[in-house]
Amino acid sequence: PHLSLADARNLHLAAQGLLNKPRRRASLEDIPATISRMSLLQIDTINIVARSPYLVLFSRLGNYPAQWLDESLARGELMEYWAHEACFMPRSDFRLIRHRMLAPEKMGWKYKDAWMQEHEAEIAQLIQHIHDKGPVRSAD
């Protein structure tokens, strides 16, 4: 079997949800569903027109209220994790990455034991903050 260049492009665009325009108005449930389809959504703070995650969702859903992303996170449908970079991921994927959470030293230079020891006090403060205030976003 041979795939033409045009077919390969269309296959890639379709897999990313970019081949066709949205057929209906977006709903709140489309936010976690779209991120699930992509596997993750990088949290990028670049803000020329809008923050990157909002533009990525707009390109797939069309016009939608930007607060839906925060609402999906607050409802526990999404979680933040360092998957590739800082990313939003479907909470249902937690079981797929838990092994990485348990072995952060295998995630590269950012998680070396020496770094963890050097920042032990800050890490303890962060854990205490989460303990006192409950689940929080990285922005908190």
Regions found by a protein language model. Give the residues of each.
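Phosphate-backbone binding and catalysis cores of DNA-processing enzymes
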Residues: 1-140
